[in-house]
A protein has these predicted regions:
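Conserved SAM-binding strand-loop segment of SAM-dependent methyltransferases
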Residues: 37-44
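NAD(P)-dinucleotide binding in Rossmann-like oxidoreductases
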Residues: 227-234, 242-266
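Beta-strand-loop-alpha-helix segment that lines the small-molecule cofactor/substrate pocket
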Residues: 55, 63-117, 131
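Predominantly a Rossmann-like dinucleotide-binding segment in NAD(P)-dependent oxidoreductases
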Residues: 1, 118-228
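N-terminal Rossmann-like dinucleotide-binding module
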Residues: 1-35
Length: 266
C-alpha cells in the first residue's frame, strides 16, 4: 500500500484520503504520518461503517480469503464504492454475487489489475479495437520472474516482529493433489486479464497443471529454518474460448527473468 495505493490516492485531486487502517497499530500510525493522512485506526469494520466515507480500498494480504472477501462484502453492504486487490474471493461464484450486489446498489467496483493501463498494453488494446490486427484467434501469455527463486525468501512477504501463530499456514499438506495456488493467482491474473481483453472472448474449457519446484523454503521472515510448503510456484494451462479461439498461459516466480516479466502475444 505504501508504494502504490496510498501515493496514488494522495496525488489525486479527485479525492481526500482521510483514514488509513492496519492491524499493526505502529504501521498504521507511521503511514498516516508519512503521507499526511489525518486519521488512522486498527478496526477495519468500524472504519468501513463510517457514514462520511465514500470509497474503501482493500489492499490487505490475503492468503485464504480471510480479508478481501469479508471486507469487500461489508463495504458494499454499507454502500461504499470498492477498489480491492486480487483475489476478490476464493470462489468465483462469490465474486459474481458481490458484483450483483454492487450493481443492485449502483456502486462502482474495481479489481487492482493495473498492468492493463501500461502504455504498451493500452496501445495493443487500441489496435485490437480498431481492427488493425484482424480476428483474434490465439493468445499466448506468460509472466515469470525470480522473486521466490531463493528458498530463504519467505513464502509470506509480510514483515513480522514475532511468530504469527494465529495465521493459517499455506501448503501444509504435501499431497500433490492438495497443492495451493500461488503463482497462478498472484502472477497469472494480470496477464490473464490482458489476454481476455485482447482475444475478446470468454474461456469455455481449460486444463491446467500446477507444480511445486522449490519444495522447501522459509515460511515467515522470523523463521530460522526452511520447511515443506506445497505451493504453486509454476503452472501452465491451455483453454478453448467460446468463439473457438485458443488461450495459453504459463506463470512462475522461481525462474530467471525480468520483473514482472510479462509476455502477451495475440
Amino acid at each position: 500500500s505504501s508504494r502504490a495505493h496510498i501515493p496514488g490516492w494522495v496525488r489525486s485531486d479527485l479525492c481526500d484520503l482521510v483514514c488509513i487502517c492496519d492491524a499493526d497499530e505502529e504501521l498504521a500510525r507511521a503511514r498516516a504520518e508519512q503521507f499526511g493522512v489525518p486519521e488512522w485506526c486498527t478496526d477495519a469494520e468500524a472504519m468501513i461503517c463510517r457514514e462520511d466515507l465514500d470509497v474503501i480500498d482493500v489492499c490487505t494480504r490475503d492468503e485464504h480469503g480471510e480479508s478481501h472477501e469479508p471486507l469487500t462484502t461489508l463495504a458494499l453492504e454499507k454502500g461504499k464504492h470498492v477498489l480491492v486487490e486480487k483475489p476478490v474471493a476464493q470462489d468465483f461464484r462469490r465474486v459474481r454475487e458481490l458484483d450483483a450486489l454492487a450493481k443492485s446498489k449502483g456502486l462502482k467496483t474495481k479489481v487492482g489489475l493495473t498492468f492493463r493501463y501500461a502504455p504498451a498494453i493500452q496501445y495493443m488494446f487500441d489496435l485490437m479495437r480498431e481492427g488493425k490486427i484482424g480476428t483474434p484467434w490465439l493468445f499466448n501469455g506468460y509472466e515469470q520472474n525470480s522473486q521466490w527463486l531463493n528458498p530463504w525468501y519467505p513464502q509470506d512477504k509480510r514483515l513480522f516482529k514475532e511468530y504469527p501463530h494465529h495465521l493459517k499456514k499455506v501448503g501444509e499438506d504435501p499431497d500433490p493433489r492438495q497443492i495451493e495456488v500461488g503463482s497462478l493467482e498472484g502472477y497469472g491474473a494480470p496477464t490473464i486479464d490482458i489476454g481476455l481483453e485482447l482475444i475478446q472472448d470468454d474461456i469455455d474449457k481449460l486444463v491446467c497443471t500446477m507444480a511445486n519446484l522449490v519444495p522447501e523454503r522459509r515460511r515467515y521472515n522470523v523463521d530460522d529454518h526452511m520447511e515443506r510448503i506445497n505451493w504453486d510456484d509454476a503452472d501452465m494451462w491451455i483453454a478453448n474460448c467460446k468463439k473457438g479461439g485458443l488461450f495459453s498461459m504459463q506463470t512462475s516466480f522461481v525462474t530467471v527473468g525480468n520483473y514482472p516479466g510479462i509476455y502477451a502475444n495475440i
